[in-house]
């Protein structure tokens, strides 16, 4: 097995929340750099879990286009500010957060009342300004998930007066990678993979690359011991199931049904022993009855009888 090393060549904090890390993975065989880089990038961006507010209830507010007396921001601006709040959650279950502030005051994420399983990455994150002695009261639902969810696709089971919020669960904002050729010795050329990761502060770039690699490892491990079943084997099982169906399932007319029964045709398996030509040889079984059976087989089971007798 080829051995390679991974090294963090740069790490820094960007602003109040963002974290950045740059990593080098080498030496890789030619072609493996782009394979590994692309797989890691997609996994890190789409498969890592993050935490976000998904629904909000504000006292006295019925819809997102409302205004709140004594509060500088309208409801839509408050929802947009809440969308920017970054959480770190140690629990997969949905949580409820609350805040109750009497003004005048500046409302920030650090004033949220949260369970011990959740923490705010940036307590200084601005939410709203209360201009007078108005009481600002809000309740919100927090979930852990992957990717991005639009408000109209969310389903809130708590109450009809919760406002849905577009939720960004992705803990990683951006991933870049590039592949460089590295000469080792006089004849050997290897790939060097450089990965840059920007996170929202809820996880570190090191955690992001580790979790992304774990997702890929679990994905590929499941392919190691697959029990491949041939399509022919699958079809034979399906055919066996269909053949055991009784002719009553075809819902034929009384005349056609009685003719088949008198000919000792009780199941689809019995019927499949006949061609269209042979059906007409059954006593009192005319062209109309034959067409009825052929149509029912095709419509209900997707089966076509051969037109002529097999040699």
From Swiss-Prot:
<dbReference type="Pfam" id="PF01000">
    <property type="entry name" value="RNA_pol_A_bac"/>
</dbReference>
<keyword id="KW-0548">Nucleotidyltransferase</keyword>
<dbReference type="InterPro" id="IPR011262">
    <property type="entry name" value="DNA-dir_RNA_pol_insert"/>
</dbReference>
<dbReference type="GO" id="GO:0003677">
    <property type="term" value="F:DNA binding"/>
</dbReference>
<keyword id="KW-0240">DNA-directed RNA polymerase</keyword>
<dbReference type="GO" id="GO:0005739">
    <property type="term" value="C:mitochondrion"/>
</dbReference>
<keyword id="KW-0808">Transferase</keyword>
<comment type="similarity">
    <text>Belongs to the RNA polymerase alpha chain family.</text>
</comment>
<comment type="subunit">
    <text>In plastids the minimal PEP RNA polymerase catalytic core is composed of four subunits: alpha, beta, beta', and beta''. When a (nuclear-encoded) sigma factor is associated with the core the holoenzyme is formed, which can initiate transcription.</text>
</comment>
<dbReference type="InterPro" id="IPR011260">
    <property type="entry name" value="RNAP_asu_C"/>
</dbReference>
<dbReference type="GO" id="GO:0006351">
    <property type="term" value="P:DNA-templated transcription"/>
</dbReference>
<dbReference type="Pfam" id="PF03118">
    <property type="entry name" value="RNA_pol_A_CTD"/>
</dbReference>
<dbReference type="InterPro" id="IPR011263">
    <property type="entry name" value="DNA-dir_RNA_pol_RpoA/D/Rpb3"/>
</dbReference>
<dbReference type="GO" id="GO:0003899">
    <property type="term" value="F:DNA-directed RNA polymerase activity"/>
</dbReference>
<dbReference type="GO" id="GO:0009507">
    <property type="term" value="C:chloroplast"/>
</dbReference>
<comment type="function">
    <text>DNA-dependent RNA polymerase catalyzes the transcription of DNA into RNA using the four ribonucleoside triphosphates as substrates.</text>
</comment>
<protein>
    <recommendedName>
        <fullName>DNA-directed RNA polymerase subunit alpha</fullName>
        <ecNumber>2.7.7.6</ecNumber>
    </recommendedName>
</protein>
<dbReference type="InterPro" id="IPR011773">
    <property type="entry name" value="DNA-dir_RpoA"/>
</dbReference>
<keyword id="KW-0150">Chloroplast</keyword>
<keyword id="KW-0804">Transcription</keyword>
<feature type="region of interest" description="Alpha C-terminal domain (alpha-CTD)">
    <location>
        <begin position="239"/>
        <end position="311"/>
    </location>
</feature>
<keyword id="KW-0934">Plastid</keyword>
<dbReference type="GO" id="GO:0046983">
    <property type="term" value="F:protein dimerization activity"/>
</dbReference>
<dbReference type="GO" id="GO:0000428">
    <property type="term" value="C:DNA-directed RNA polymerase complex"/>
</dbReference>
<dbReference type="Pfam" id="PF01193">
    <property type="entry name" value="RNA_pol_L"/>
</dbReference>
<dbReference type="InterPro" id="IPR036643">
    <property type="entry name" value="RNApol_insert_sf"/>
</dbReference>
<feature type="region of interest" description="Alpha N-terminal domain (alpha-NTD)">
    <location>
        <begin position="1"/>
        <end position="227"/>
    </location>
</feature>
<dbReference type="InterPro" id="IPR036603">
    <property type="entry name" value="RBP11-like"/>
</dbReference>
